[in-house]
Amino acid sequence: MNLTLYAVNAFLILDSSGKRIFTKYYAPPHLKEGEGGVFNSVKEEKTFEKGLFEKTWKTQNDILTYDGKLVVMLTVMDVIFYIVGGMEENEVMLYECLRSIRDALELLFKYVPDKRTLLENYDQLVIVVDETIDDGVILETEPALIAARVTKGPVSEAQAIVSDFKEMGFMNSFQKAREKITERILKGTF
């Protein structure tokens, strides 16, 4: 039984031919090299990925064991999302983490992520994964919160006001605009 918070050994996104789009491996600080899913080299990581892809390419299973690890996968368009954990991990928790990353990406991109979209928005992909998993610890599983942390805030005050108006009704918006204009007239900046 795993009593630590370190649930994730790796998060992978491979394309339909098994090539890397995104990979991130996590090494819990209390384990030594070679223990508990920690790979010693990129060559070992790629060998693991190739074998995993070959085993899962034609399967419809979402959860499986491979190389002594629990693997949860999700196929989306032309990419496959994998999350790898130890055999003692809760597969429902891992699946929820994987699904939340996929859903956060859908919220950000406004449609289902495919290979091209992921590569074009690689910076947002990296931030989504980092906001969800930190050193193998699952931090957040609510897609809307993850996406909100990734999106950029308003750049200027005018954009902030427009953003606020979208959230308010017409009368509230009118009142807010009236207050802002009055405030600027009194300051002499209008």
From Swiss-Prot:
GO terms for biological process: intra-Golgi vesicle-mediated transport; intracellular protein transport; retrograde vesicle-mediated transport, Golgi to endoplasmic reticulum. One of its GO terms (cellular component) is Golgi membrane. Keywords: Cytoplasm, Cytoplasmic vesicle, ER-Golgi transport, Golgi apparatus, Membrane, Protein transport, Transport. InterPro entries: AP_mu_sigma_su, Coatomer_zeta, Longin-like_dom_sf. Disulfide bonds: none annotated. It is a peripheral membrane protein. It is found in: Cytoplasm; Golgi apparatus membrane; Cytoplasmic vesicle, COPI-coated vesicle membrane. Belongs to the adaptor complexes small subunit family. Oligomeric complex that consists of at least the alpha, beta, beta', gamma, delta, epsilon and zeta subunits. The coatomer is a cytosolic protein complex that binds to dilysine motifs and reversibly associates with Golgi non-clathrin-coated vesicles, which further mediate biosynthetic protein transport from the ER, via the Golgi up to the trans Golgi network. Coatomer complex is required for budding from Golgi membranes, and is essential for the retrograde Golgi-to-ER transport of dilysine-tagged proteins. The zeta subunit may be involved in regulating the coat assembly and, hence, the rate of biosynthetic protein transport due to its association-dissociation properties with the coatomer complex. PANTHER family: COATOMER SUBUNIT ZETA, ZETA-COAT PROTEIN. This is Probable coatomer subunit zeta. The gene is ret3.
